[in-house]
């Protein structure tokens, strides 16, 4: 990569980080102004268009980055699990770390999931689907269950995890710890239920084939 290309990438990165830094519990992406984001990134507002077509393209890039960041962290969690950690507890701890370290990235995913922009809703849905698919792959490999079962289990788990994440954004450390314990219990219940449901289905098949 040449010097000019490196500088362009650095400025683009600064714009993304500037936009993330301006999000908060009170401030959504829709309320950000191009001028403020450009000023925070240290460039003239007119230079913004050298990097993004418009503010929406910046937002979609942020959604993609948030989803990718979360998936990469969960992959690292699965590597930790492979070394002997508890699957559910390690995954929950990693997820809560993500929210603690990147609250605005998670806020963006939550808000735009049901926001007014169809493009943003589709982008968030795509990221969540990637997340579900990766978890289903892992469950299929570990539990030796058919894809239909692991996908249903993964979708239930991700739905509960995102709901808990929304609560975790605005509570203190002690409440977050309690929330984490509740989430571990809920996910274990889903995992047990999926296992017994699958076993029951297998028994039915075996019974009918006799």
From Swiss-Prot:
GO biological process terms, semicolon-separated: fatty acid biosynthetic process; negative regulation of fatty acid biosynthetic process
GO molecular function: DNA binding; DNA-binding transcription factor activity
Pfam families for this protein: TetR_C_46, TetR_N
Transport in keyword set: no
Cellular localization per UniProt: Cytoplasm
Residue ranges: DNA binding: 33-52
HTH tetR-type domain span: 10-70
HAMAP family to which the protein is assigned, alphabetical: HTH_type_FabR
GO cellular component: cytoplasm
The keyword Cytoplasm appears for this protein: yes
Top-level taxon: Bacteria
Major place of residence: cytoplasm
SUPFAM superfamilies: Homeodomain-like
Function: Represses the transcription of fabB, involved in unsaturated fatty acid (UFA) biosynthesis. By controlling UFA production, FabR directly influences the physical properties of the membrane bilayer.
Assembly with partners or alone: Homodimer.
Organism: Salmonella arizonae (strain ATCC BAA-731 / CDC346-86 / RSK2980)
The protein, known as: HTH-type transcriptional repressor FabR
Keywords (A to Z) from UniProt: Cytoplasm, DNA-binding, Fatty acid biosynthesis, Fatty acid metabolism, Lipid biosynthesis, Lipid metabolism, Repressor, Transcription, Transcription regulation
Taxonomic path: Bacteria, Pseudomonadati, Pseudomonadota, Gammaproteobacteria, Enterobacterales
Stretches that traverse the bilayer: none
């Amino acid at each position: 990569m040449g010097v000019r290309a490196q500088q362009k990438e650095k400025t683009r990165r600064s714009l993304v980080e500037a936009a993330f830094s301006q999000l908060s519990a009170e401030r959504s992406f829709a309320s950000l102004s191009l001028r403020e984001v450009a000023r925070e990134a240290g460039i003239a507002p007119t230079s913004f268009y050298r990097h993004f077509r418009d503010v929406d393209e910046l937002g979609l890039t942020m959604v993609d980055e948030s989803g990718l960041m979360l998936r990469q962290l969960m992959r690292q969690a699965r590597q930790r699990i492979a070394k002997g950690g508890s699957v559910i507890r390690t995954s929950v701890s990693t997820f809560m770390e993500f929210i603690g370290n990147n609250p605005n990235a998670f806020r963006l995913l939550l808000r735009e999931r049901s926001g007014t922009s169809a493009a943003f809703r589709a982008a968030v849905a795509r990221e969540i689907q990637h997340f579900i698919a990766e978890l289903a792959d892992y469950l299929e490999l570990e539990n030796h269950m058919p894809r239909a079962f692991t996908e249903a289990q993964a979708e239930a788990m991700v739905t509960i995890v995102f709901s808990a994440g929304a609560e975790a954004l605005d509570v203190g450390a002690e409440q977050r710890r309690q929330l984490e314990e509740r989430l571990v219990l809920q996910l274990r219940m889903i995992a047990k239920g999926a296992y017994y449901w699958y076993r029951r289905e297998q028994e039915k098949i075996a019974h009918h084939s006799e």
